[in-house]
A protein has these predicted regions:
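Hydrophobic C-terminal alpha-helix "anchor/cap" residues
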Residues: 158, 253-257, 293-294
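Conserved NTP-handling cores and scaffolds of large molecular machines
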Residues: 112, 193, 212, 233, ...
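Surface-exposed charge patches
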Residues: 107, 125, 252, 292, ...
Length: 329
């Protein structure tokens, strides 16, 4: 790790970041932070401004206005100082195909001013951590699969023991097995360094990240832990109920325990069974008692199950919001 320095309240700060290209605004009034040791998912539709924001934070692009800091150091006022604390792996990270893995990482360690006495040690360490020693040692980068090239990119990012790592789409184009390996690798960084990661694979973000920041059209629409966002953005609980009762009979029982309950039109399945969707307020006590209520009433039931909302549902709800609603979250 870099030389000891006071622990800042936030490892990464974006404050009112704005980036304009003439009349086109790519990022507008965007504010969020990443705490030391925290893994944060940075999400948004295509063209939302994610890569632009990451480039501004990494110092590879200047913003039009606003403030960006890495470990308390201004990216605009002291870019070299900020970059000493930072590693950035862009989307489609280019690598020299005619170099061997160890050669490339050794060169990168020297370029990053790793102490000469520690270069070999650091190369061995990141190769071990990224599962490259056993699978890629001595091989040309051009001979590696895309998954292992991504590992080389992440190993490069970790060489100088940065306090902050920014990863733009690190799992793009990988198969499920490769994605799992990268996910475990990123998860292992928790507590050691702050990680900001963008990805379109929402399930992986949900598995790895402590919280998420969601932007749309360059503006913040939601941020926080997924459990908190689920309560905020998805205020209803849905149940699938398969029964032989009529919609009116089911609705009467549901509204008896929760007046705000609704029963959506059913879909006939087979042998007289119908599949309904029952919707309750998310905080309703009836969520805990609905199954017991229906069974106690003698309702013929084949299935009752509560819907589980994931990050995809949160993402869809968030990207339908206005920026003003996002700032209030």
């Amino acid at each position: 790790m870099n030389e000891a320095a006071p622990l800042p309240e936030a490892a990464v700060v974006a404050e009112k970041l704005t980036k304009r290209y003439g009349s086109l605004t790519a990022v507008e009034d965007l504010s969020f932070s990443v705490a030391p040791g925290e893994i944060v998912g940075f999400l948004g539709p295509n063209g939302a401004g994610k890569s632009t924001t990451m480039r501004i934070l990494s110092g590879t692009m200047s913003g039009t206005s606003g403030r960006a800091t890495i470990w308390g150091v201004s990216v605009a006022l002291d870019p070299a100082g900020a970059k000493r604390h930072l590693a950035y792996m862009p989307e489609n990270n280019p690598l020299p195909e005619d170099m061997r893995v160890e050669e490339y990482l050794t060169l990168r360690a020297r370029l990053k001013d790793v102490a000469p006495s520690r270069v070999d040690e650091r190369v061995r360490k990141v190769m071990d951590d990224c599962d490259l020693t056993r699978r890629a040692s001595g091989r040309l980068i051009g001979q590696l699969s895309k998954g292992f090239r991504q590992r080389v990119g992440i190993a490069d990012a970790l060489l100088a023991e940065p306090r902050v790592v920014i990863l733009d789409e690190p799992t793009i184009g990988l198969d499920p097995h490769q994605i799992l390996g990268i996910r475990d690798l990123i998860r292992s960084l928790r507590g050691q360094m702050a990680v900001l990661i963008s990805s379109h694979i929402l399930h992986e973000v949900e598995q790895v990240c402590d919280k998420v920041v969601i932007i749309n059209r360059g503006r913040l629409v939601a941020q926080g832990r997924t459990d908190d966002l689920r309560r905020e953005l998805l205020p209803h609980a849905g149940f699938t109920v398969v029964t032989k009762a009529s919609q009116a009979e089911l609705a009467a029982l549901c509204t008896a325990v929760e007046p705000a309950a609704t029963v959506e039109d059913g879909v006939a399945t087979d042998l007289g069974w119908t599949r309904y969707r029952v919707v309750l307020p998310a905080q309703s006590p009836a969520r805990e008692t609905l199954a017991t209520t229906l069974l106690s009433a003698g309702l013929p039931l084949r299935e009752i199950a509560e819907e589980r909302y994931g990050l995809e549902d949160i993402f869809l709800a968030a990207t339908r919001r206005t920026p003003a609603e996002g700032r209030r979250s």
